[in-house]
Curated annotation (Swiss-Prot):
UniProt keyword annotations, A-Z: Chromosome, DNA-binding, Telomere
Name of this protein: Telomere-binding protein 1
GO biological process, one term: regulation of telomere maintenance
Start and end residues of each Ubiquitin-like domain: 351-430
Domain HTH myb-type positions: 529-588
Description of how the protein assembles with itself and partners: Homodimer.
Extent of Polar residues compositional bias: 263-272
Stretch list, region Sufficient for telomeric DNA binding: 506-615
Primary role: Binds the telomeric double-stranded 5'TTTAGGG-3' repeat and regulates telomere length and structure.
Disruption-associated phenotype: Severe developmental abnormalities of vegetative organs and impaired reproductive organ formation. Chromosomal fusion in mother pollen cells. Increased telomere length and frequency of anaphase bridges containing telomeric repeat DNA.
SUPFAM superfamilies per record: Homeodomain-like (SSF46689), Ubiquitin-like (SSF54236)
An MF annotation (GO) of this entry: protein homodimerization activity
CDD domains noted in UniProt: SANT_TRF, Ubl_ubiquitin_like
Length: 633
């Protein structure tokens, strides 16, 4: 009975019958058998056909055997094949010229491969004996393939394994319906006796049973259109190759390649028994095919691009563009690594230091008032030159700490290449005499300056910094060329200097009484380590302030400064102005609300009177500067 084609299967072949389920058994470990050197049912059939065709070639005429009709060669049109009632699936690929070793194709056009292994057949002795008997019958009777056997069924159909179409089967092998060989075979078949034909049919049935009892390793093949030629090549490398020249009708039947990679064989023996109607269903649905195709694409991509061998490795990019930002970051990182490697490779331990300025010790210069500015510059220059000629001692400060041990290396002291060198400071200190005080240089040991240089000589004293060496905190450093320095208050000295005084340059006139004390200059840089000391006004200073305001007024604070506090440098005119406002406020409130040092009430009354008087004078003059008058008491 011929199965009808189903819409869901199309030209994919037969629908396999439902196989009844068997009780689940314990899993049994099956040993994998060697695939090489195995002989399968298809090889057995090819061997039988080889012997049959060899005997037939000897009987037939030689020159007309290998002729091929020109119409078939030119047209190559597909012809529907015959479908068998109980056919077994065949897995095949296109026959190549290089792979046709051991393949014998007769005048009927049957093509096959000879496998060189018979291990699978050796395991089944009954199957081997049956095969031998069939081969003997086929050898003795070359025309054993009768018309009514399983090969010569005339039921028209199309094998749907995706290989295209197979021409119609004749009585002996495969023949084209229009060929003259088919007519000759039919006439020979009709001329045979009935007994011989029945014997041949029985031998063919035995061969069919032998083939179906073997477990053929079948796999789904690629699809091909129904209009394709017989012998469609399904492998890429097989395209462009012609079939073996011994194939008469140019019919290429598919068979497995004989290499180790694609060889398929009888790995496990068949357990179907006598169930001749069962055909394994190896054609999956669309989902399985799509999944299989996606896995193939993924495997090919991994093979090209590289797989991840471990979690730490990165998957190599294959024909993918890297973003510009990421590429720039990687280039910058590589440059930094190269620079770091270059610096690390250098074995130089040189330390580069930049000295911008030195801190020199404090200089105390005494010069009379009638001296000129040029004489002052000359005196300072001579004093500094004398100190330098005498000798200086360089001190090193690292992060505010003095390094006293001269035997330490720079690395031991913390001065190396990799650290910041901005915290290193240098100081210049005077060398003291052996017989003198540590902070005094004896005048007899110094060079003298002529008396004609200045009108009255100056006294210059060189002192060393304090013991802690904290950047001359007790004796702050100075810059002699700093124009924004602040002078210390002048101290009037009435004592006569002697030969054992702290003078570098001796006096020209030892009877001089009025000497100017020129203090050390300060830099403009703010010293955050020092704060201005708060010095409250005393009663005497308040009395001087009130007296000056009574004579000069409340709007002339600079004049008040030079009149009453000229020699007091820690009192500025701003301090005097603020103190006057405080005194006015203190005098206007009750005594219980006053805070701070007590001020006599008499002075507070004078403050209120002077404030009222000068306010009235400014109102009368309408903004004109007030005339200095003595406030009436």
């Amino acid at each position: 009975m011929v199965l009808q084609k189903r819409l869901d299967y199309g030209s994919h072949g037969h629908r396999a019958p439902i196989k009844p389920r068997v009780a689940t058994l314990a899993p049994v470990k099956r040993s994998t058998r060697i695939r090489k050197k195995q002989m399968y049912a298809l090889d057995l059939l090819a061997t039988a056909a080889e012997k049959l065709l060899a005997d037939q070639d000897n009987l037939s005429s030689g020159p007309n055997i290998n002729e091929t009709p020109e119409g078939y060669v030119t047209s190559m049109k597909p012809v529907k094949a015959e479908q068998f009632d109980e056919a077994f699936p065949l897995r095949s690929v296109a026959v190549k010229k290089d792979d046709c070793k051991g393949c014998t194709v007769g005048c009927a056009g049957i093509c096959g491969f000879l496998r060189q292994a018979n291990m699978c057949l050796a395991e089944n002795s009954s199957t081997q004996n049956l095969a031998d008997s069939v081969l003997e019958s086929l050898t003795a009777k070359p025309d054993v393939l009768a018309k009514d056997s399983f090969v010569s069924s005339k039921k028209s159909c199309r094998l749907g394994f995706g290989l295209g179409t197979i021409p119609e089967y004749g009585s002996v092998g495969v023949c084209q319906p229009w060929s003259t060989r088919s007519a000759e075979v039919k006439q020979v078949h009709r001329a045979r006796p009935t007994a011989i034909r029945s014997q041949e049919d029985s031998d063919a049935a035995a061969l069919c049973a032998l083939v179906e009892t073997m477990d053929l390793d079948t796999k789904p093949l690629a699809e091909a259109s129904s209009g394709s030629n017989s012998g469609v090549h399904i492998c890429g490398p097989d395209r462009g190759h012609n079939s073996h020249p011994s194939c008469l009708a140019k019919v290429q039947h598919a068979a497995d390649r004989d290499d180790d990679e694609n060889s398929s064989g009888c790995v496990h023996p068949s357990t179907s028994g006598n169930n001749r109607g069962y055909i394994p269903h190896y054609i999956g649905d669309r989902r399985i095919r799509r999944l299989f195709a996606s896995r193939l694409r993924k495997a090919a991509r991994n093979r090209i691009c590289g797989e991840m061998s471990c979690k730490g490795n990165k998957l190599s990019l294959c024909e993918k563009k890297m973003p510009t930002t990421r590429r720039r970051v990687q280039q910058t990182t590589l440059k930094r690594k190269r620079l770091a490697q270059l610096y690390s490779e250098k074995s130089s331990d040189e330390v580069k230091l930049t000295i911008k300025s030195f801190n020199i010790p404090e200089l105390l210069i005494e010069i009379p008032e009638n001296a000129t500015v040029g004489s002052l510059k000359k005196t300072v220059s001579d004093a500094v030159t004398t100190i330098i000629e005498r000798g200086l001692r360089v001190g090193i400060l690292l992060q505010g700490k003095n390094i006293q041990n001269d035997n330490k290396t720079l690395r031991q002291a913390g001065i190396c290449r990799g650290k910041k060198l901005n915290d290193i400071g240098f100081t210049l200190e005077c060398e003291a005499g052996q017989d003198s005080h540590p902070g005094v240089i004896v005048p007899e040991e110094m060079d003298f300056v002529g008396a004609s240089v200045v009108d009255k000589s100056a006294t210059v004293k060189c002192e060393e910094p304090a013991e802690n060496q904290q950047l001359m905190q007790d004796f702050p450093g100075c810059s002699l060329s700093d124009p924004g320095s602040v002078d210390y208050p002048v101290e009037w000295s009435t004592q006569e200097t002697s030969a054992s005084s702290q003078a570098i340059v001796p006096f020209a006139d030892p009877n001089s009484l009025a000497l100017a004390n020129v203090p050390l200059s300060r830099s403009k840089r703010p010293d955050f380590g020092q704060r201005r000391i708060r010095r409250p006004f005393t009663v005497a200073e308040v009395e001087l302030l009130v007296e000056a305001v009574e004579h000069l007024g409340t709007g002339r604070w600079r004049d008040v400064k030079f009149r009453a506090f000229e020699n007091v440098h820690h009192r500025t005119y701003v301090d005097l102005k603020d103190k006057w406002k405080t005194l006015v406020h203190t005098a206007s409130i009750a005594p219980q609300q006053r805070r701070g040092a007590p001020v006599p009430q008499e002075l507070l009354d004078r403050v209120l009177a002077a404030q009222a008087y000068w306010s009235e004078q400014q109102a009368k003059l309408h903004g004109d500067p007030p005339v200095p008058e003595i406030c009436p008491t």
